[in-house]
Amino acid sequence: MNEQTVLAPWPEHERTTSSVLFNNVPCAVLVPFIKNAGGLDLLFEVRSKTLRWQPGDISFPGGKIEASDVTPLAAAIRETGEELNIPPEKIRVLASLAPLETVTGVTLNPFVAEVSSVEDIRCTAEVDHTFTVPLQWFMEHEPELAEMDLATRPGATFPVDIPYAGNPMEWRRRKTYFVYIYRYEG
């Protein structure tokens, strides 16, 4: 496998330019690789279970682009430092990928980078732990394709007794999108 294979553009059907339902939130993530004797490993983090937003989720380091961030890349590097204590000099940026507009209103700016080693990682309160998966494993395994529904549901204070509200149980999903699921046991 060569670097071109790793950095190949996403197929067109995986990109979305659909209109979003919420205010746009610009975010940036780092897709970190670690080079080792066996090839390249992809580094993931597991978010702390104490977080209010997506606790326990598996993710890449990243987050909202702050006003102090000069560029989306600066945000991705800052977030990686905040979450994993990896200093900027231990991050070698390889490429930027096309921004991805999500149905939830996040514009994601991804950057592929090599980080020096797992020994440099010191998880902060935002991250429970990290793990790596050999890139070769992804090349050898097909993901499951699962549907997610984005729907509008009334909150606890929504007045369902007024005539125009109708039966909230009859409200339908507004958008279906697909997610790829890999089940790695390593």
Which positions does each model-derived feature cover?
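N-terminal leader/linker segments that precede catalytic domains of diphosphate-processing enzymes
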Residues: 1-59, 64-119, 127, 136, ...
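Phosphate/pyrophosphate-binding betaalpha-module
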Residues: 124-131
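Sequence-specific DNA-binding recognition helix
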Residues: 132, 138
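Short acidic, Gly/Pro-enriched loop/turn segments at secondary-structure junctions
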Residues: 139-149
